[in-house]
A protein has these predicted regions:
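C-terminal segment of classical bacterial N-terminal signal peptides
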Residues: 5-13
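Transmembrane beta-barrel domains of Gram-negative outer membranes and organellar outer membranes
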Residues: 14-242
Length: 242
């Protein structure tokens, strides 16, 4: 059984790419900015997860987004806790009509024993069709250290900001490799709407299918609180904002 999921790296407890969405974009925020993403997910098979993911962007010669996701989850009748440190940096900036790239890497750990559960590395790519529409493609590698197996990670997402405050996201993602349960390597899907009334706060409502490899349906409610760097201009003024 896969036991961790961080951003695209997938498993049985948590993930964090763009809030509760699994497929990441190539962008990172400005140096000095921070955000707190949190969400609660519940499945038709009684699985459950509660996640908090604080992150900040620092300059260590190059802007790097550092985050530590923590989760409390119920899976296969058992409760558990994990945390997942991750570092992400942009390699090629995104822009309308061109492809941007980034890379991130990290791992997941059992919060009680400190045991290293997974190691992962993912390369997100983003193609912006316009100021209000983009396509995200993810590819990467996951090492499940519990069963000592390696997996290929993949993801495809589409974001459309169809009003000033509403954004639609559709995504398919998963992992390829040998697994004891067939559902672990079957594709996973999510569709959700983000309500973002201002640059500080947003709310996500997401429907998912098989998102932890358990062959169940999921409902997720998530929030993001953003803390921009001092004296920065609003994101919509800077970039056109998606």
């Amino acid at each position: 059984v896969i036991t961790a999921l961080a951003a695209l790296p997938i498993g049985d407890n948590a993930r964090a790419a763009n809030g509760a969405f699994a497929v990441d974009a190539a962008d990172i925020s400005e140096v000095g900015s921070c955000k707190l993403e949190s969400w609660i997910s519940t499945a038709t098979n009684t699985d459950f997860s509660l996640v908090a993911n604080p992150s900040c962007v620092v300059d260590i010669g190059k802007p790097v987004e550092l985050s530590v996701l923590s989760s409390r989850f119920h899976s296969d009748g058992e409760w558990g806790n994990s945390f997942q440190p991750k570092a992400k940096t942009n390699l090629v900036p995104t822009g309308i009509g061109k492809v941007g790239f980034s890379i991130y890497a990290g791992g997941s750990f059992d919060a009680l024993t400190g045991e290293n559960l997974t190691v992962f590395a993912v390369a997100p790519a983003t193609y912006r069709l316009s100021e209000t529409m983009r396509i995200n493609v993810n590819g990467g590698w996951l090492w499940d250290r519990i069963v000592d197996r390696h997996f290929l990670l993949y993801g495809l997402g589409w974001d459309w900001k169809f009003t000033d405050v509403l954004q639609l996201t559709l995504e398919a993602f998963g992992q390829a490799g040998q697994a004891d349960r067939p559902s672990v390597t079957r594709p996973r899907f999510q569709a959700g709407v983000r309500y973002r009334p201002n640059e500080i706060f947003s709310v996500d409502l997401i429907y998912g299918r098989n998102i932890m490899g358990e062959n169940a349906n999921w409902i997720t409610l998530g929030t993001t609180i953003r803390f921009p760097p001092p004296e920065s201009r609003p994101a919509r003024e800077r970039t056109g904002h998606l």
